[in-house]
Amino acid sequence: MKNKYSDLIDQTFHFPTEEFKTTEEGELLYRDIPLMDLAKKYGTPFRFSYLPKISENIQKVKFWFADAFAEHNYNGSYNYCYCTKSSHYKYVIEEGLKNDIHLETSSAFDLDLIKKLHNEGLLGLDRFIVCNGFKTDLYIDKIIELIEMGFENLHVVLDNTREFHLLKGRTEKKIKLGIRIAAEEEPKFEFYTSRLGIGYRYIVPFYEDLIKNEPNMELKMLHFFINTGIRDTAYYWNELRKCLNVYAKLKAVCDTIDSLNIGGGFPIKRNLNFNYDYAYMTVSYTHLTLPTI
């Protein structure tokens, strides 16, 4: 009779996995690291970061996009931006930077990290710095400070007109802007974020009425964020196509826009039953065609 917990695992999941396995003595290992040793040393629950996996995943996603681009003769480029709010630990960010990546920030605190990384010689002025999140007065102050320092590829993603007016007149240097689209929420999603960003039909007027005539501001990016992350659902692809329609309309009146920033990212493995075809989803992106306006 099978009545052990290990029997339930065997019947429910494919085990061992790429990450987890057990020894003959029944010890649980994560990538050959004995977890019981860590539990005895640090107590439970505990959380740790496995640094080699960070670089491995970044290189994987770069390969998937390069492969998909080659398949469709796409001449654009893919730039991976690490979102600092996912982990502010120095050793995590430094591991990511070993892979020629860029950074996305969400608060004034994050820009202190950017400044420190630059002062330590770990982050060049040519890196893309995508400033997302709600812009407090302090956040705006630090954005201007980095622009004055010479961060030539810092992009400020605007959520609303208020943020535009906070930036206006703050520096004589060029300010590169992005606009966040307020995507429609997935039906019955428990947390609503559509209040963040600018509605589809207001984006072109927002550019033409406010940004277009500012001599030191240029629109470079459209930011698309879905809170579920990148999923193979009709809802997700429908929202992305709507975003591409807006991008095409913007491109028709704004020759400086050249980037589509995809937020949310790929889902990560949080349980043994996780199944997601990353390579397929990457290729699916390149099957989408930009509308002709």
What residue ranges belong to the model's regions?
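Glycine-rich beta-strand-to-loop/alpha-helix junction loops that act as flexible
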Residues: 227, 260-269
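Generic structural signal for well-ordered, non-membrane alpha-helical segments
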Residues: 31, 47-54, 58, 160, ...
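Active-site-proximal beta-alpha core segment in soluble small-molecule metabolic enzymes
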Residues: 74-259
